[in-house]
């Protein structure tokens, strides 16, 4: 019997959900992910005792199938509800109608059940899809894979997908029309803690659009107090070529401007550049 294999490029939520469904149908699946970890933007940065959910801040469940997945994760202790005090600009914001869910102990816990019993190659970037008579071969960092895949699912940001799929038909060339927005994320730890007026704050204008006290989330370290800031897409695009140190310094100053006060020197600060955030 022919050994039929499928490849999935990208180990974020979409890629792992695809791989999981293929595996449930008894297909042989291999996932390739250029990052070392799973989850894509469902990410938590850990530095010693500190934890920053520096990608997606929470998830909501709106589809029936995803709600079932969330219920399974909740029963397994991999999910918890976050009910922060929220402000928008300088006004209190009503509590969300739908629950905000976070992964436990980190955001990537939401996708780990999807990855069970699936062959995953982390830290491996796929650079080219090579058609053959029986399917597809993959060119990666480590060279040409000695495997023929019947089909390949590409679950990566549009610019990366375009580079892989563009040479294989006009329909794929439309991917180049997709424009994705970047996001600089700032990560700051304070000891003693600061009072920003709420656990999560939104701003409708200015460099920062979101600030969240990560320490207000269930299961996250309480001390030192950790904060995550998301810059606007416009500010992020304008400063896309900064290094992380310079970006963190600017984001801290912008946070002070938003709060209207000087903040103590953080015991830790860093920044992460999401080139393809939204």
Regions found by a protein language model. Give the residues of each.
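Central helical "cap/lid" subdomain
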Residues: 39, 145-201, 261-264
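Short beta-strand to alpha-helix junction loop
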Residues: 58-65, 83, 87, 91-113, ...
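A conserved short coil-to-beta-strand element within the FAD-binding core of flavoproteins
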Residues: 122-137
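Flavin (FAD/FMN) cofactor-binding core of flavoprotein oxidoreductases
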Residues: 249, 253-278
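Beta1/beta-strand and adjacent pyrophosphate-binding region of the FAD-binding site
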Residues: 1-14
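Active-site substrate-recognition segment that forms the wall
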Residues: 187-242, 246-260
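Glycine-rich FAD pyrophosphate-binding loop
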Residues: 9, 20-48
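N-terminal FAD cofactor-binding segment of flavoenzymes
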Residues: 21, 43-86
């Amino acid at each position: 019997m022919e050994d039929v294999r499928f490849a999935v490029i990208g180990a974020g939520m979409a890629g792992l959900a695809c791989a999981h469904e293929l595996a449930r149908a008894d297909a042989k699946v291999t996932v390739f992910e250029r990052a070392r970890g799973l989850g894509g933007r469902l990410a938590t940065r850990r530095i010693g005792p500190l934890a920053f959910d520096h990608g997606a801040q929470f998830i909501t469940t709106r589809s029936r199938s995803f709600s079932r997945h969330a219920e399974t994760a909740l029963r397994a202790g991999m999910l918890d509800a976050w009910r922060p005090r929220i402000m928008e600009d300088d006004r209190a914001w009503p509590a969300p109608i739908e629950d905000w869910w976070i992964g436990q102990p980190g955001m990537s816990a939401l996708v780990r059940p999807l990855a069970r019993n699936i062959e995953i190659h982390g830290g491996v970037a796929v650079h080219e899809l090579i058609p053959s008579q029986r399917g597809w071969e993959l060119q990666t960092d480590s060279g040409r894979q000695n495997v023929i895949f019947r089909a390949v699912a590409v679950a990566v940001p549009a610019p990366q997908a375009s580079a892989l799929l563009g040479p294989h038909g006009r329909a794929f060339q439309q991917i180049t029309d997709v424009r994705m927005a970047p996001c600089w994320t700032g990560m700051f730890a304070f000891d003693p803690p600061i009072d920003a007026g709420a656990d999560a704050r939104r701003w409708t204008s200015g460099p920062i659009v979101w600030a969240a006290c990560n320490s207000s989330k269930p299961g996250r370290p309480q001390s030192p107090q950790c904060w995550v800031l998301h810059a606007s897409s416009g500010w992020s695009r304008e400063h896309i070529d900064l290094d992380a140190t310079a970006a963190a310094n600017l984001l801290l100053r912008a946070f002070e401007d938003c709060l209207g006060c000087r903040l103590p020197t953080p015991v830790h600060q860093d920044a992460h550049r999401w080139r393809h955030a939204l």
